[in-house]
């Protein structure tokens, strides 16, 4: 089988996406080492990878050039690690909710996030998220930066968990067309 430069580029994009798993693992290690700042730095780098890998994949045409690899599944697995598992562990490990809720809230986050990830209507045709999009990494970052009270954190987690099932539109920071000029990166 002949491999051309387009196939190599497609595999390179998949490898770049896959680097998010390594960054997520490093965030996990930082959490277990009680290094909150380090864990957020690793998750921040993973977020940057996630923010540009889709654009690269579309530009390179990975679906055509590497048809046996499913970049959407790869991205979803890594997103679940970095947007759900690591933040839920942070809530538990760094005691961000009141005593007695430290196991319940991460379990709630896992459950509602599983729904988010299997919901085929999670993204609208105009690139919004329908329902809270399971960006728990951002939520936990706000808890950390604002040094919010454990009870406030608990209430926020419950509200966002409920909003997962409410058909309200949430802005996708990179792809929504109507607010594209206000978002971090422009879709090329």
Regions found by a protein language model. Name each.
Residues 4-11, 34, 66, 70-73, ...:
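Juxtamembrane loop-transmembrane helix junctions in multi-pass integral membrane proteins
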Residues 43-50, 109-119, 157-167:
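Alpha-helical transmembrane segments of multi-pass membrane proteins
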């Amino acid at each position: 089988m002949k491999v051309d430069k387009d196939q190599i580029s497609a595999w390179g994009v998949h490898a770049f996406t896959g680097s998010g798993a390594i960054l997520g693992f490093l965030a996990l290690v930082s959490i277990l080492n009680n290094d909150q700042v380090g864990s957020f730095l690793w998750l921040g780098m993973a977020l940057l990878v996630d923010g540009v890998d889709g654009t690269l994949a579309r530009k390179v045409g990975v679906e055509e050039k590497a048809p046996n690899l499913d970049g959407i599944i790869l991205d979803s697995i890594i997103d679940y690690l970095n947007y759900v598992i690591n933040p839920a562990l942070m809530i538990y490990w760094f005691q961000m909710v009141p005593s007695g809720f430290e196991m319940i809230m991460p379990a709630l986050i896992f459950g509602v996030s599983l729904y988010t990830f299997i919901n085929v209507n999670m993204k609208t045709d105009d690139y919004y998220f329908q329902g809270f999009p399971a960006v728990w990494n951002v939520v936990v970052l706000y808890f950390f930066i604002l040094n919010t009270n454990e009870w406030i954190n608990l209430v926020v987690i419950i509200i966002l968990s409920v909003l997962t099932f409410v058909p309200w539109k949430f802005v996708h920071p990179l792809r929504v067309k109507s607010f594209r000029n206000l978002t971090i990166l422009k879709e090329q």
